[in-house]
A protein has these predicted regions:
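N-terminal secretory signal peptides
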Residues: 1-14, 18-22
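Early extracytoplasmic/lumenal segment of secretory-pathway proteins
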Residues: 37-102
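Extracytoplasmic ligand-binding site segments that recognize negatively charged/polar headgroups
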Residues: 75, 94-235
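Paired acidic/hydrophobic, glycine-rich loop segments that form the ligand-binding mouth/hinge
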Residues: 91-94, 223, 240-245
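Periplasmic-binding protein-like
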Residues: 207-216, 246, 254-280
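Oxyanion-binding "anion nests"
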Residues: 229-249
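Conserved C-terminal helix/tail region of periplasmic/extracytoplasmic solute-binding proteins
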Residues: 232, 342-376
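Mature extracytoplasmic/periplasmic domains
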Residues: 279-348
């Protein structure tokens, strides 16, 4: 029997509050659902890059359709976009796992039949992934994941020097600490550095202590960056340490000759997890289901893992097997070999905490703290 992850009572009002922080941004790029009723178009709300031909061209050809993507950055923006869009505007949404309970509570995603998807092909740890199940019912299927820790310039810092988040406060790091401008992973890392496990379920005293520690980093900061700016700042050396990001950025840079790596510090790291859901109100439920099946098939999983500019870990053992058979060098680089050390080791060693939304504070409280930090 599957069990749901305890999320508490979350109302539609809570859902709307989560999207307020990005409301203005969403308004400047409002989605126009011109293709909502076109049976040959799958409308897809997702993080950037997930409608790249490398990922979706095969699906489009097999089904005689085109995928139209509306891109967002950060779950708060995703919530704002989907809330402000007429029903039927989107058929599928790729969401971070920590936002699934808000999508479910607001009745924006369909219940899924587990038998429709290859969950038995997944690593056992991910077959009943708690953030995707509510009252024993499935609402999202994991597509990929990765770890967030401390990314660093390998010419300037040794692995020993960055074995703890304490490296962020070192004299050597002054003016060299870059921040991904999203409160959740950045503050989650600082919470871990303060010994909070789990890092997002903390009382007011621990929250205030975490804020104080965060604010003490301002003299160390080189800047607050978008995704594109993170890539460039690590490449040009302006940022030499960045908490709360991971190999989804540093692996691609390293393969292009940039001296960067990511470590999970002794205080632990975070796991980001992406999943696909069917948006309630879609007239193309069957096509949406086929797209999730395609993405979680061994072939779809290998493509998710090996996209040139955004390499990821995948939950499907069948995908791992196909990757090792067809692209063994990539499997080794991605630490997804079936023998020897691999990316599941950190998970099994309990070094990883799920990235989640704040439990004991409002999302706005964390966002406000982040804004205050940036304005110091």
């Amino acid at each position: 029997m599957r069990t749901s992850f305890p999320m508490g009572d979350i109302s539609r009002r809570s859902f709307l509050k989560a999207g307020v922080a990005a409301g203005a941004l969403a308004a400047t790029s409002r989605w126009s659902p011109a293709d909502a009723d076109d049976p040959k178009v799958l409308n897809y709300l997702s993080w950037p890059g997930n409608a790249d031909p490398y990922l979706v061209e095969q699906f489009e050809k097999e089904n005689g359709v085109k995928i139209r993507i509306k891109e967002y950055v950060g779950g708060d923006q995703m919530l704002a976009v989907i809330n402000q869009s007429p029903p039927g505007s989107f058929d599928v949404v790729l969401a971070d796992a920590e936002y699934m309970h808000l999508l479910h509570a607001a009745d924006f995603v369909e219940e899924l039949d587990p038998a429709d998807y290859p969950l038995k092909d997944f690593w056992p740890e991910f077959q009943n992934f708690p953030l995707h199940w509510f009252d024993g019912k499935l609402y999202g299927v994991m597509t990929d994941f990765g770890y967030l820790g401390l990314s660093y310039n390998t010419k300037e810092f040794t692995p020993k020097e960055v074995a703890s988040y304490a490296a962020l406060w070192s004299d050597k790091a002054k003016g060299k600490v870059g921040f991904f401008d999203w409160y959740l992973p950045s503050m989650g890392s600082i919470s871990l550095s303060n010994g909070n496990r789990p890092p997002f379920d903390i009382d007011e005293a621990k929250f205030e202590a975490m804020k104080e520690k965060l604010f003490s980093l301002k003299p160390q900061a080189s800047g607050f960056y978008t995704i594109a700016d993170i890539f460039s700042s690590l490449t040009n050396g302006r940022a030499q340490l960045v908490p709360g990001i991971g190999e989804w950025i540093t692996l691609g840079l390293r393969m292009n000759g940039v001296p960067v790596d990511t470590i999970i510090p002794e205080e632990g790291g975070l796991q980001w997890t992406e999943s696909l859901s069917i948006v309630k109100g879609t007239p193309k439920r069957d096509l949406a289901r086929k797209f999730i099946q395609y993405t979680t098939s061994p072939e779809g999983q290998v493509k998710m893992a090996t996209k040139v500019d955004n390499k990821k870990s995948i939950p499907s053992i069948a995908g791992w097997k196909l990757l090792n058979q067809t692209m063994p060098k990539e499997a080794e680089i991605l630490r997804m070999t079936l023998t020897g050390p691999n990316v599941m080791d950190e998970y099994k060693a309990k070094k990883i905490q799920f990235r989640q939304l704040p439990k004991q504070q409002e999302i706005a409280d964390w966002n406000d703290a982040w804004s205050e930090f940036k304005s110091l």
